[in-house]
Amino acid sequence: MELLFTLMTLIAFSVLGLLLAFLCFIMMIMFMGKSIGDPEYPPVKGTVFHQLFYFTKLHDYHTQMAKTHPTFRLIAPDQSEVYTIDSRNIEHMLRTNFDKYSKGKYNQNIVSDLFGLGIFNVDGDKWRQQRKLGSYEFSTRVLRDFSCSVFRKSAAKLVRLISEFSHEDLVFDMQDLLMRSSLDSIFKVGFGANLNCLEGSSKEGSEFMKAFDESNALIYWRYVDPFWKLKRFLNIGGEAALKRHVKLLDDFVHGVIKTRKAQLELQQDSNVKEDILSRFLMESKKDQTTMTDQYLRDIILNFMIAGKDSSANTLSWFFYMLCKNPLVEEKIAQEVKDFTSSHESEPNIDEFVANLTDATLDKMHYLHAALTETLRLYPAVPTDGRTAEADDVLPDGYKVRKGDGVYYLAYAMGRMSSIWGEDAVEFRPERWLNNGIFQPESPFKFIAFHAGPRMCLGKDFAYRQMKIIAMTLVRFFRFKLANGTQNVNYRVMFTLHMDKGLPLHAIPRS
């Protein structure tokens, strides 16, 4: 017995010794050749292990460091990660020296299982091809009219569903409803498919949404997990779950592509293809070598995260802000009544949404300001960046080396008094208005839609969707937090998702 105890103790200490040796090796790799303490390079404020420790509040961790060091570094085993809130650096990277910064192998390796060769994960010819096609599609009147029609129907469905909760005085998860509604809309606009996820009648749709959100979070975890490649090789932990989720996504999307191809074969006499996938499929006939089903799958999933998550997440934070700022909610409600001529106590929902024309949406300056203010504080993509393709010097004087990741902190920027004034952390739509007219800021200061040549193609598309949903829901309901004044936290993933949803009560305005 004593011998067994001695052997077990020896084994335990041996394992501990190997672990310590491995950690020492990792730390040596992390700090060698990284110019620690060199004033020409951004100051080192931590390592990837610090991000691991603060992961659940990662964006606030970055914000605290950026308050004292607008540009700083975190050290990882295979590269330095430079973080900045300096708009000069951001413009330098995203526009002035666009060709010197790419997505980079490091980022591409991390996200390729989910995003493949989609527009958010490629450079060069593939990026230009998708950008050109996407730019054309988003500029067509056909897509504009079709998408607005879909958004109006989605808004009406939301009102009817929330009315049921309201009449029974039930608490509901607003984020979940917005995610389901947005998924339905994006599938209809993007792929010509009726998913019926909001009504809950589509098990496949619900499973797809869950798999997509979980994949989003698990992929982002790779940025702070130095052992993710080992876990993927062994097919354990989160990597095993990610593999299952991605397979479900692949099977579902390839099924959508197959179905749409078959439908198009029966519609050959029609030249007007309203949904985006149909027009990409028509394009694929000209270039069957490049535009494979797998390539279309990648394009679809990139479109999904841009369309579903960005709008639904922003609207979730928007309604959270309205609950925290009821005077803002009432100002928006009054603006909606004034510009839709719907002062009657109980307007007809179908007639109301039918009147939400482009001309009406364009008049909603206060609503536009409130949505933009939401994006300032809760950007859909809280952190984004590029990889330096050559040694460079940033406008603030700091050097970066070839291979360094350079990230801009949109979430932190929205909270900086040096950028937005002493009231930076306050939700104040008025900061965007001049005599009641919306005034935009530089995209390198307000970075929610990216900037430069890769600026978001769907910006106007997103604002139209958000305005139609927001106008409709605010016209028919007042909203209150189900848990009183309790704060809502985010879940760390590519997009700024609420952790545990947004439980609300809805009170009919009539």
Regions found by a protein language model. Give the residues of each.
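Central I-helix of cytochrome P450 enzymes
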Residues: 182, 186, 246-253, 283-340, ...
